[in-house]
């Protein structure tokens, strides 16, 4: 979640773009803590789309043994077929604004034989009615930009995942951060508050650290919250 105060030119905006790009592409997005929903202020949607697209465009897909390659393949062709199917399902209710299922380059490997996949960025302009992005998970480098108009909407959208392992809010407004955490916490295993002051010490959005909760309510766990 991008805070309303985290506008282009702030350290927090840059942190947000960097963190989202990292969580989309590390292990080709095949992580249970990867960012699937990018919740941003409606007024900043265009800025986020442009900045994130520019950063994702630097992704070099291919054989990880080759210098310069920074994203490898999916686990296998079966996984590629599954992610492709999920992307096609998501495409029915939202628009791809970066990436392609076919038009991308692969370095040092055969694109047609390997399970390579381009980062795919969606935009969902009506996330309260077009709910696929909350219910369909493409387990690869796939994520959706979702606009909100106020912190209450951001909380509601975050909770529409019906249980998530981890959520982050990137803001320097501690009042807004507190309101978000109080409202969204019961649907998340953990929530990271990230800003310039703590960035150098932060392990990041998706780090599975021994002392952090790695599980959660609803879809994020096996019912541990129910005893």
Describe the role of every protein-language-model region.
Residues 1-128, 152, 156, 184:
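ALDH superfamily catalytic-core signature
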Residues 1-7, 18, 22, 54, ...:
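Conserved C-terminal structural/oligomerization subdomain of aldehyde/semialdehyde dehydrogenase
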């Amino acid at each position: 979640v991008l805070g309303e105060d985290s506008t282009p030119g702030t350290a927090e905006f840059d942190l947000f773009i960097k963190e989202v790009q990292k969580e989309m592409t590390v292990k080709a997005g095949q992580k249970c803590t990867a960012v699937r929903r990018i919740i941003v202020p409606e007024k900043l949607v265009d800025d986020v789309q442009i900045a994130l697209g520019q950063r994702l465009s630097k992704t070099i897909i291919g054989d990880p043994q080759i210098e310069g390659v920074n994203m490898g393949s999916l686990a296998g062709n079966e996984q590629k077929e599954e992610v492709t199917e999920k992307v096609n399902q998501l495409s029915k209710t939202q628009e791809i604004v970066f990436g392609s299922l076919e038009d991308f380059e692969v370095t040092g490997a055969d694109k047609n034989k390997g399970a390579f996949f381009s980062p795919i960025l969606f935009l969902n302009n009506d996330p309260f009615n077009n709910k696929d992005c909350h219910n369909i998970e493409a387990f690869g480098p796939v994520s959706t930009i979702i606009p909100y108009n106020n912190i209450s909407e951001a909380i509601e959208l975050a909770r529409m995942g019906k249980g998530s392992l981890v959520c982050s809010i990137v803001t320097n407004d501690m009042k807004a951060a507190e309101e978000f955490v109080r409202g969204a916490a019961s649907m998340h295993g953990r929530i990271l508050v990230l800003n310039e002051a703590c960035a150098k010490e932060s392990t990041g959005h998706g780090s599975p650290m021994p002392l952090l909760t790695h599980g959660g309510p609803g879809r994020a766990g096996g019912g541990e919250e129910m005893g």
